[in-house]
Amino acid sequence: MVFKKTQPSPSLKNPERIQSFKKLSKKIGIKFSKIEYYNTAFIHSSYKNENPEILEDNERLEFLGDSVLGLVAARSLFQKYPKASEGELSRIKSKIVSTPILNSIAEKLNLGEYLLLGKGEKNSQGKGRRKIAANLFESLVGAIYLDRGFEVAEKFIVQHLLEFAENPDMEESVRDYKTQLQEYSQKHFKTLPVYRMKGESGPDHSKTFQVSVRIRDQWEASGYGASKKIAEQNAAKELYIRIRRGF
């Protein structure tokens, strides 16, 4: 992502700065009533730290935008997948509001063009650069919410974010393989699958669990995940697919 070079001042008295927001307003199809919200949304904390006259950066708007984003995503997925469990909805939500996807949207909208970034931070690469872009999308959502209200912010989010929910990989995330395996096992083997914890690894804040699932002594598979439930789902998926393929 290409970020705009640091300007001497983010003052809205700067004609170039005002013109840039008119350009952004036209690009995203939202009329800005209070440009100061958007000005703040595009001031990174590193720029504020290097310019004492700047009173506020975009971190508070980022916090607000993250909450609005989460609500819109949760409500939309709740309506889209009426049979999905809480765990399944959480998994797909975490994917569509993840840093890589938010970064992709920021890239698509070229939000870095409007960002005031400190000299030191401009040299960041890789994950640091992607995180800045993702946070920028959240701060823009926060500004839209304050300026135009929830409905406009929701429309903007749905337009640019929830298209990712239509991705086949997302559809796959909400398939309940435990239920499918259980129903198949009862019908064809007259018994229920048996799950067992095989182990866990990693630090307390980032554990990986291993679970095995067996049907009689005939079929067995293992799965891994950040929680026991996810590991069970992955094990069930592995065994279900294996059984259906006949090996």
Curated annotation (Swiss-Prot):
InterPro entries: dsRBD_dom (IPR014720), RNase_III (IPR011907), RNase_III_dom (IPR000999), RNase_III_sf (IPR036389)
Organism, scientific name: Leptospira borgpetersenii serovar Hardjo-bovis (strain JB197)
PROSITE patterns from the UniProt entry: DS_RBD (PS50137), RNASE_3_1 (PS00517), RNASE_3_2 (PS50142)
Family affiliation: Belongs to the ribonuclease III family.
Protein name as annotated: Ribonuclease 3
GO CC, alphabetical: cytoplasm
Functional note: Digests double-stranded RNA. Involved in the processing of primary rRNA transcript to yield the immediate precursors to the large and small rRNAs (23S and 16S). Processes some mRNAs, and tRNAs when they are encoded in the rRNA operon. Processes pre-crRNA and tracrRNA of type II CRISPR loci if present in the organism.
Swiss-Prot/TrEMBL keywords: Cytoplasm, Endonuclease, Hydrolase, Magnesium, Metal-binding, mRNA processing, Nuclease, RNA-binding, rRNA processing, rRNA-binding, tRNA processing
Domain of life the protein comes from: Bacteria
Enzyme Commission (EC) number: 3.1.26.3
Subcellular localization(s) per the UniProt record: Cytoplasm
Record domain RNase III: where: 21-149
Keyword Metal-binding: yes
Positions contributing to Mg(2+) binding: 62, 135, 138
Domain spans labelled DRBM: 176-245
